[in-house]
Amino acid sequence: MILYSFAKINLSLHLLGKRPDGYHEIETLMQTVDLADKITMTECKEGTTVTCSDPIVPSDERNLAYKAIDLIRSNYRITKPGIQVHIDKQIPVASGLAGGSGNAAMTLHGLNKIWSLGLSREQLMALAAKLGSDVPYCLFGGTARASGHGEKVKWF
């Protein structure tokens, strides 16, 4: 399966203060742009493998796509089959364009289809919120307003 995770920009960003959990309370307007990482997902016999065309990107538990796989496996008790994910990186690393968040979001979408999980939009959003502030938005992209620490998303 091939999926594309698109970069996003913040058209506006208001920091409203720091929360007790360490996150910042925000209000932001986000938009996807025409720059994307290509995510290739393939079932295999067992295990989890994440690779990336950019050697700077970790291929272990520090990678958000890897964390998305672990989250799905633990929440739905999936041990087999295995999954291989390759990220062809086009979005610059650590650029603030949500590259890693988008990779995690598309990994959630891909696993939902490959493993026939039948997860609803709401279930995907709840899982995404556990992975990072931009991941819920990156599930569906487009133009949206986000608040909280980014987990509350309303699309236009």
Sequence positions of predicted segments:
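Phosphate-handling active-site elements
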Residues: 73-84, 108-127
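ATP-dependent small-molecule kinase catalytic core of the GHMP/sugar-kinase superfamily
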Residues: 2-4, 12-14, 18-28, 117-156
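A short glycine/serine-rich beta->alpha loop
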Residues: 51-59, 89-98
